[in-house]
Amino acid sequence: MAQAGLLIWLFFTILLLDLTCTQSAKLKTQKDHRSKEKDGDLKTQIDKLWREINSLKEMQALQTVCLRGTKIHKKCYLSFEETKHFHEANEDCIAKGGTLAIPRDSEENNALRDYGKKSLHGSGEFWLGINDMVNEGKFVDVNGVAITYFNWERIPKGGKRKNCALLNQASQGKWVDEVCRSLKKYICEFIIP
């Protein structure tokens, strides 16, 4: 009988140990799962912080641009004395986080004209981010959006040869079409968020 009692005790002890190990494994799995969730949440928070930091850096860079250039409404303009072809000038503006300047109304055009006079010494004209390269006579901005404001000195008749617009200081800020390979000064615009 003592032997039977010992066997029963041994059986229950083994059963109890098995249950304890099973529960321990389940708890460890749950703990690992919670830990992974926390790690995922932490990674999400870190990613969000990096995005915010990058956004702040962009805003700081724009403020620097505005300090060196001029601010008009929700745009900053920055002029460059170096002469470039239309495409090179636009690529340079894009590399800096903007585009060639695109006046959307007469107020912007006049402000851009005045800023160009002040900042581009001895220059009578500079590139605008406007062209009709794709469809002759249909002027679009450098993003491909149709232009709704126009300030032409004369109706562009440059044909396939003159496809890029520039602002002419001598004609009080009127636009003229020009050969895109011409070397001109330029002004970049940056949208302020």
Swiss-Prot record:
Pfam name, any one: Lectin_C
GO CC field: extracellular space
BP-aspect Gene Ontology terms: ossification
SUPFAM superfamilies xrefs: C-type lectin-like, Triple coiled coil domain of C-type lectins
Coiled coil: none
InterPro entries referenced in this protein's UniProt entry, alphabetically: C-type_lectin-like (IPR001304), C-type_lectin-like/link_sf (IPR016186), C-type_lectin_CS (IPR018378), CLec_Tetranectin-domain (IPR051663), CTDL_fold (IPR016187)
Disulfide-linked positions: 66-76, 93-188, 164-180
Protein name, entry field: C-type lectin domain family 3 member A homolog
